[in-house]
């Protein structure tokens, strides 16, 4: 069984640490090496692998220093993105073994052109694609690509835990409630998140079952969501509703 720990970085990033029972570990999207090295030293862990979801600096900035400190560490990441430190470029459908668990690589283009995720042991590391109550900005891809990426994620088992890379939940809930002010699941989740954040606790991981009740970007066929965006698009097909939602969130 793998154990997952969060290492906070910058203002709102999470670097995820995946640990086995033998004090060996991997990290996901280490934008900063310093907090990772501090955690590894404090807990006497050895770094075996670095998993990268996309090329943005707040996800890869710490990789060169970690490679210097741990020569021979595997650096796994998207083959279609400009990341010079990769030792193991991977793409959609590839598999990798990590501490006895098989992880499947998912192509999740949209936020960036070559964004990927990793799913295994009922855990999804999805970078900046799916957030709790939200989704990533479409910075290099198209609405269709992000739409397809989210649908690929929602096809996973509903118990899948979602480890996204940022603590955006409270802000996402504010937007989600603007879309669905009468959503009781959202109202309850807002209260839960407010309690956690008041104690400086993380709201992540979330899970797919919960997100389907609260995340407007997964609820684009719900009548309440379609009605909310009706003044922004005359189309009611799922992609048009999703695209209108993402444009609305950009200016929210």
From Swiss-Prot:
Function: Thiolesterase that catalyzes the hydrolysis of S-D-lactoyl-glutathione to form glutathione and D-lactic acid.
Catalytic activity, reaction form: an S-(2-hydroxyacyl)glutathione + H2O = a 2-hydroxy carboxylate + glutathione + H(+)
GO molecular function terms noted in the UniProt entry: hydroxyacylglutathione hydrolase activity; metal ion binding
Note on how the cofactor is bound: Binds 2 Zn(2+) ions per subunit.
Assembly notes: Monomer.
Cofactor: Zn(2+)
Name of the top EC class for this enzyme: hydrolase
Keyword entries, A-Z: Hydrolase, Metal-binding, Zinc
Entry's EC annotation: 3.1.2.6
Gene symbol of the encoding locus: gloB
Stated name of the protein: Hydroxyacylglutathione hydrolase
Metal-binding in keyword set: yes
Classification via NCBIfam families: GSH_gloB
Pathway assigned to this chain's UniProt record: Secondary metabolite metabolism; methylglyoxal degradation; (R)-lactate from methylglyoxal: step 2/2
Record Pfam families: HAGH_C (PF16123), Lactamase_B (PF00753)
A biological process from GO: methylglyoxal catabolic process to D-lactate via S-lactoyl-glutathione
Residues involved in Zn(2+) 1 binding: 54, 56, 111, 128
Residues bound to Zn(2+) 2: 58-59, 128, 166
Protein family membership: Belongs to the metallo-beta-lactamase superfamily. Glyoxalase II family.
